[in-house]
């Protein structure tokens, strides 16, 4: 019942936009469309070095499934919204002890659009920053899970898997959009402060710092190679 309520709210607030507004709902989508089309011509970073994780994903959907890129950019925002709220619900269910609180939290987040539409407006569009939010939430969850592990269990396989998942999630935020990484980074700082007594211990500190550095390197490496090869930075990175 709660799932149906959440799905109903999502379809009413976001899904009906597919019918009511068939087209681009943000002015910068044509720019991203151009960059993705250039990838089809073998030109990555055509307008300068920029996080291209989102563009690679759209390009993959276009190439493998044969759907026109402009159509994907018109419709895919709703897939993003579904995944975002699904990840949020899963995280809340894993962290909350109360059975119904996660559903209430997600529903309240969705219907908040009625009171603050401008805050949610860009989620009506297929954009890199909004797509990257899907991976901010797992970054937060896996870092919390890591600090919840007792010292004697840090060498277990589960700990390695948690750190690997954190590295992948955080790395994906950086590969998709820097703003998502900033949000994830601020959340990570808050979590580290909350678990400060464990964070400063060598066993925890070394593991999480090495994991964090590796996750950044994985995301930055393709961009660094392109920049070292003479491709300039895309202008918006100066924002």
PLM region descriptions:
Residues 1-239:
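Membrane-embedded transmembrane-helix bundle of lipid-linked glycan/lipid transferases
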